[in-house]
């Protein structure tokens, strides 16, 4: 049994219908009737000595579970068991996207775009380096102010001139030097009250 080749995923979407003995156009009532009939025939309690009946019963249950779920049945009808595997891996809502992106024309489009943009270097330059290091960057709208670079030296000079203009009276007294013991040796007694409680 270990030497047995693993079953490949089909894309036709017909084998589950064959398990139940139906064709692809079967209604949900036909699926239920066929399932009940085959489940009674191959149930493990009715065939305790037959391990093949237990395997057949598992296949019947699997086919019934997939074909009675409308979403899974639709995926199976379109893409076969490969579609069910993709739905398991990526989610049922992403199956169509997966098959579109894995089609030959989507791969060809990706390769052509890669070749036209020098392995996507142009895209990287436009997104990361602001369109050729800023040479081709888009113009700002008429009403908005454009951003410009200010050197740190110019900014420092501007801040110092603003400080000089803002102070009306110069500071004449130097602050007293302080150490860790300043509060301990001070002549006045410290007050632990806040301003509101004096």
Swiss-Prot record:
Occurrences of domain J (ranges): 13-82
UniProt key word Lipoprotein: yes
Disruption phenotype: Defective SNAP-25 function, which causes neurodegeneration by impairing SNARE-complex assembly.
Coiled coil (UniProt feature): none
Annotated localization: Cytoplasm, Cytosol; Membrane; Cytoplasmic vesicle, Secretory vesicle, Chromaffin granule membrane; Melanosome
Modified residues (Phosphoserine): 8, 10, 12, 15, 151
GO BP of this protein: chaperone-mediated protein folding; negative regulation of neuron apoptotic process; neuron apoptotic process; regulation of synaptic vesicle cycle
Keywords: Acetylation, Cell membrane, Chaperone, Cytoplasm, Cytoplasmic vesicle, Lipoprotein, Membrane, Palmitate, Phosphoprotein
Keyword hit for Acetylation: yes
InterPro entries with a match to the protein in the record: DnaJ_C_subfamily_member5, DnaJ_domain, DnaJ_domain_CS, J_dom_sf
Any single Pfam family the record assigns to this protein: DnaJ
GO cellular component, as recorded: chromaffin granule membrane; clathrin-sculpted glutamate transport vesicle membrane; cytosol; melanosome; membrane; neuromuscular junction; plasma membrane; presynapse
Topology within the bilayer: Lipid-anchor
Outcome, altering residue 93 to V: Reduced interaction with SYT9
Oligomer status and interactors: Homodimer. Interacts with the chaperone complex consisting of HSC70 and SGTA. Interacts with ZDHHC13 (via ANK repeats). Interacts with ZDHHC17 (via ANK repeats). Interacts with SYT1, SYT5 and SYT7, and with SYT9, forming a complex with SNAP25. The interaction with SYT9 is stimulated tenfold in presence of calcium.
Main function: Acts as a co-chaperone for the SNARE protein SNAP-25. Involved in the calcium-mediated control of a late stage of exocytosis. Acts as a general chaperone in regulated exocytosis. May have an important role in presynaptic function. May be involved in calcium-dependent neurotransmitter release at nerve endings.
Official protein name in the record: DnaJ homolog subfamily C member 5
Organism: Mus musculus
